[in-house]
């Protein structure tokens, strides 16, 4: 047990370094910097390259990684945060998430995605402590963290620039009027935070012994969780949150096994969000309650199509593509249609009500496994299983997320992100039902009214019908009285509540609708590919769906179809590698948010 606690403290030490950087940036800019985790991952891989490939001593590699990470943080601030500092929260949130995608996949392209041994420039088991052997590397990591925290505290308390940071965090406008160089202070916060993140990545690699771009980046994500648990904007809370998460992770693995790690980490995070959203040490007003989208991403009006436009599109999509493109183009079309079915209802959730879900892969996974199991275990017909999959996804996702809709702002995004990891953890761990990491194989192909859908052209045309129904339902909802109410909830929730609207209920309803169609898409995916495993439903799927919606226009259902065509169809048709695709997605999101925030299929209001 002692070695488990010490292991938790060592992990928590790294998480604390990452969390401090996240809290520092949030305190100064009010931005939840999702890219901080990727800086940790990139710093870890850069340290491996300096030590293993170039043969540098560890202290020189540490300094080089600190400098390189600081530079990366400065670039992220310059390109994705500073230009959007006056925009609604969704803008910078999505931009930093996109920067995270770019950095993660750039790391995989540069260093390769495989797992490799991390160099051990310092002894790892030469210090006996209470029957457990620690290493000089652990002592150096602890010492660095303590020294960094003490120096940061003293600097913020007594240093001139530190006082400027505190003034900017308290009120940037007032600080600017008093002569504080707010822009320089914001740059400084990114430099310091990124430096801490990169160094934390090296310490993680030294302790873990083996590393890959994904594992290092995930460590950064857990550091973000630690910052939120401790309280965004609180340095002391970030340190405490890091050690709490580290201990919880180690004790959970010790008691239940490594398969439950994500369940413990993100389950605890979700619990803290529900019981004390501002964190253990954070201010109750740290994350402001305001519309996430405002008029920034929702300013455009969707371009309307005449009836004959729809007829022409239906003929081209339904007949020309399978006849002229054959099975290859039809296979691409099925993927486009499935992602469009997920994305179109998101225009209600994100566009109308202003709620950003970073875990939409969760209801997709629930629907996929529900449909596959209903057909394989209970022998239900495909169409009935398809509908039930949507219902199961809507009910389960809504029940699990029901408490989070009382939250505001960034909290909803963070909670849905946690939900995505929790669902994946349950799928991986529930071997008796889901077969865990091995997945479900031999899922029957769809059969509609006695007609089996065996070839790609059949799958594509059926998916197209489901997409058409999805578009019809969402267009009708947007044009109805309910659609008007949802827009009022997203535009100004306080005003909507003052008019007697039960805003939380409308958010829940909108999420249930989006989850229902996501479940349908998951069922289609399961039966058309005949195989499922947890790696299909990663956070990258959720990010891709959100990217599709942003590209097409938050308020444009047909824009979501075009977004799916551009971001799913074109890369698939061009046979781009997965890493290159996600890198492209990140760049597209940043460009759209910066230069065309209303999306492609909209006109300015």
Placement of each model-derived feature along the sequence:
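Transmembrane alpha-helical segments in multi-pass inner-membrane proteins
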Residues: 15-20, 55-67, 187-275, 345, ...
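Membrane-interfacial amphipathic/re-entrant helices at transmembrane-helix boundaries
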Residues: 1-18, 46, 53-61, 87-93, ...
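Single transmembrane alpha-helix segments in multi-pass membrane proteins
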Residues: 2-51, 75-91, 183-184, 188, ...
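Transmembrane helix-bundle core of multi-pass membrane transporters
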Residues: 83-84, 89-158, 185, 209, ...
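Alpha-helical transmembrane segments within multi-pass membrane transporters and channels
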Residues: 22, 55-99, 106, 240-245, ...
